[in-house]
Amino acid sequence: MPLYVIDKPITLHILTQLRDKYTDQINFRKNLVRLGRILGYEISNTLDYEIVEVETPLGVKTKGVDITDLNNIVIINILRAAVPLVEGLLKAFPKARQGVIGASRVEVDGKEVPKDMDVYIYYKKIPDIRAKVDNVIIADPMIATASTMLKVLEEVVKANPKRIYIVSIISSEYGVNKILSKYPFIYLFTVAIDPELNNKGYILPGLGDAGDRAFG
């Protein structure tokens, strides 16, 4: 299963600040940017590369690495919470082409944990994805029921990219299993997997509403 939980001391340190309800809006956004950059570098370890030879200023030839896939990256930003996360990803992939998807889910407040939520895509602008060439990275800080992500994946899978990556900060166990059971070939990168969802579909312990905490 291509699931990567990046639970290193530095990522968990940043995540702890994100979870803290006393972290202010500016620092919340900055920490999302920091994690986006780190997760981008982790993704780069799975991209195609070639061994090359270069000559140093001292006239000595040496072997090196050229990550060829750095020229074949498309980042899709699920508005609005993913904006700082994508800012960090772009620091790792400065040549990436970008797309945006605006999606909203119908809020629920029942007695039981929702297994699916109605999602409406109100805006979509995605660059052409080259089949079996481009690596598509879909960014969303929180994967709860995975209803939004599955809706976006329906669009991306049709383009038949080389690889599809999902980047999140916190994912629920339910959401991860739901995505990877339907699309077992997808690479899912997250910092933490939380065990529960509440009756509104929010992750517990989570970090609250990422969009509201980042932008008010």
UniProtKB/Swiss-Prot annotation:
Coiled-coil annotated residue ranges, if any: none
Ligand binding (5-phospho-alpha-D-ribose 1-diphosphate): 80, 105, 140-148, 209
InterPro entries: PRibTrfase_dom (IPR000836), PRTase-like (IPR029057), Upp_A (IPR034331), Ura_phspho_trans (IPR005765)
GO BP terms: GMP salvage; guanine salvage; hypoxanthine metabolic process; IMP salvage; UMP salvage; uracil salvage
Record-listed CTP binding positions: 29-30, 37, 87-96
Annotated GTP binding sites: 30-34
Regulation: Allosterically activated by GTP. Inhibited by CTP and UMP in combination.
Catalyzed chemical reaction(s): UMP + diphosphate = 5-phospho-alpha-D-ribose 1-diphosphate + uracil
Protein EC: 2.4.2.9
Pfam families hit by this protein: UPRTase
Keyword line: Allosteric enzyme, Glycosyltransferase, GTP-binding, Magnesium, Nucleotide-binding, Transferase
Tagged with keyword Glycosyltransferase: yes
GO cellular component: cytosol
Function: Catalyzes the conversion of uracil and 5-phospho-alpha-D-ribose 1-diphosphate (PRPP) to UMP and diphosphate.
Family (UniProt): Belongs to the UPRTase family.
This protein's name: Uracil phosphoribosyltransferase
